[in-house]
A protein has these predicted regions:
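Small-aliphatic-rich amphipathic alpha-helix that forms the alpha element of a beta-alpha
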Residues: 51, 70, 98, 139-143, ...
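Positively charged n-region of N-terminal signal peptides that target proteins for export
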Residues: 1-9
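Short, small-residue-rich loop/turn micro-motifs
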Residues: 37, 143-147, 215
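A glycine-rich helix N-cap at a beta->alpha junction
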Residues: 201-218
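Bacterial N-terminal signal peptides
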Residues: 8-19
Length: 218
């Protein structure tokens, strides 16, 4: 009897966790980010000198302004007349999407409108990597390649190009973080199968890397 009750309680607990982490929220609205501040920052050579990886994060929240600046630096539109971005992409496919996991939920960055589109409610940060620190970092970026935008390229070419393009974007994040005194680390240690299910990605959407961002722990 006790074992049966324990089993039932375990199932209920697991289902409740799943509901929190993967449920869609129809009532949530897009978050309009402030215009990115593009006329400040430190000299490039100093930023390159200070660029580094950090795996220790404060739980201090990142402001919407800093997040807007960060995402614009990563892969924002820097030439509005053509829609070209701050990082290059093969054939200008712009196949990389940036998903933003915070304590408030999972969002998709829309560079055209500088908004965060709600994807999932609930905090899924712990699912974005296998390291303990990912759940402490206030922002975890998930880089997802949409192969449907890459025309008739061969599968191996899509994988190569999207990996290279993600590298450009993640380095932009590194440089912005170095300029602003933020901590960051790009990560490949991800349970991609589980995270793909949580994010409800299509078969032609592939998780490439993730990147944690926050203030350094003091």
């Amino acid at each position: 009897m006790q074992s049966t009750s324990f089993f039932i309680l375990t199932i209920v607990w697991a289902l409740s966790i799943m509901c929190v982490t993967v449920s869609y929220s129809d009532e949530r609205k897009a978050v309009k980010l402030p215009n990115p501040q593009v006329d400040n920052g430190r000299p490039l050579m100093q930023v390159l000198r200070d660029r580094s990886s950090s795996r220790s994060f404060s739980t201090q929240k990142i402001s919407d302004q800093i997040l807007s600046n960060l995402l614009w630096a990563a892969f924002g539109i820097n030439r509005p007349d053509t829609g070209r971005r701050t990082a290059p992409s093969a054939v200008n496919w712009q196949e990389i999407d940036i998903y933003v996991a915070t304590a408030e939920g999972l969002f998709l960055y829309d560079a055209k409108t500088q908004t965060l589109e709600p994807v999932l409610s609930g905090d899924i940060r712990s699912a974005t990597g296998k390291q303990d620190f990912v759940k402490e970092a206030p922002v975890n970026l998930i880089y997802v390649a949409d192969f449907s935008r890459m025309g008739t390229a061969q599968k191996e070419d899509k994988e190569l190009y999207s990996a290279a393009d993600t590298g450009f974007i993640s380095q932009n994040v590194y440089l912005y973080c170095a300029s602003e005194g933020l901590a960051t680390v790009v990560r490949g240690s991800i349970d991609k199968q589980t995270l793909t299910k949580i994010m409800k990605l299509r078969p032609d959407q592939k998780i490439i890397l993730a990147q944690s961002v926050g203030y350094p722990k003091k």
